[in-house]
């Protein structure tokens, strides 16, 4: 039985040897310069592939870093200004409380005035905790970034482009404008 296996191995090994011999004979037939040239071409191809992979790695790493920065910036924006829409809805309530206070003061309703003042103060304090601050407009120079001009008043009492009267308060949310102040602006008399 051992002889039989050995003969099978010999018969299967013979075709492999025949197949390998043309390759080895071609390799042996190539001159050393041709082999060096072929190896240099292979090396150049691998170096080019390596450079492409390195460039791709650098680009992907930069993309990842940009993604991280953008995500952090968006997260910070959300934390700082995520309450903006809620606060915009609360501002008309503050305006109405202020109107009620001015009306109650004119009519002399002290009990009602004190209650509304207390509610108004609590609401302003709650808004302040979220970073909402009123814009100071009286006597300030007109700034279209923070003020909305409703009327122009020709006057000598105030320099031109100065806020004369405030119709509705403006508010900032941290450093961003939440709502512009509605104002009248002084102009030079004609």
UniProtKB/Swiss-Prot annotation:
Keyword Coiled coil applies: no
Biased composition, class Basic and acidic residues, residue ranges: 1-10, 32-42
A GO biological-process term: protein folding
Region (Disordered): 1-42
Major site of localization recorded for this protein: cytoplasm
GO MF terms, alphabetically ordered: adenyl-nucleotide exchange factor activity; protein homodimerization activity; protein-folding chaperone binding; unfolded protein binding
Any single Gene Ontology cellular-component annotation: cytosol
Source superkingdom: Bacteria
Gene3D superfamilies listed in its UniProt record: 3.90.20.20, Head domain of nucleotide exchange factor GrpE
Biased composition (Low complexity): 12-30
Entry similarity comment: Belongs to the GrpE family.
Function of the molecule: Participates actively in the response to hyperosmotic and heat shock by preventing the aggregation of stress-denatured proteins, in association with DnaK and GrpE. It is the nucleotide exchange factor for DnaK and may function as a thermosensor. Unfolded proteins bind initially to DnaJ; upon interaction with the DnaJ-bound protein, DnaK hydrolyzes its bound ATP, resulting in the formation of a stable complex. GrpE releases ADP from DnaK; ATP binding to DnaK triggers the release of the substrate protein, thus completing the reaction cycle.
Subunit architecture: Homodimer.
Name the record gives this protein: Protein GrpE
Organism: Pelobacter propionicus (strain DSM 2379 / NBRC 103807 / OttBd1)
């Amino acid at each position: 039985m051992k002889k039989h296996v050995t003969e099978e191995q010999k018969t299967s090994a013979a075709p492999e040897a025949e197949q390998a011999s043309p390759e080895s004979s071609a390799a042996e037939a190539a001159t050393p310069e041709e082999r060096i040239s072929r190896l240099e071409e292979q090396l150049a191809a691998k170096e080019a592939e390596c450079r492409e992979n390195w460039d791709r790695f650098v680009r992907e790493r930069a993309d990842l870093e940009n993604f991280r920065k953008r995500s952090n910036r968006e997260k910070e924006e959300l934390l700082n200004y995520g309450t903006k829409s809620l606060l915009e809805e609360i501002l008309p309530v503050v305006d109405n409380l202020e109107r009620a206070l001015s009306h109650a003061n004119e009519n002399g309703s002290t009990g009602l005035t004190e209650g509304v003042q207390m509610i108004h103060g609590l609401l302003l304090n709650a808004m302040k905790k979220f970073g909402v601050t009123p814009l100071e407009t009286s006597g300030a120079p007109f700034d279209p970034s923070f003020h909305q001009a409703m009327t122009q008043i020709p006057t000598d009492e105030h320099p031109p482009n100065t806020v004369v009267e405030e119709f509705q308060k403006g508010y900032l949310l941290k450093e961003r404008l939440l709502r512009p102040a509605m104002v009248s602006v002084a102009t030079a008399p004609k």
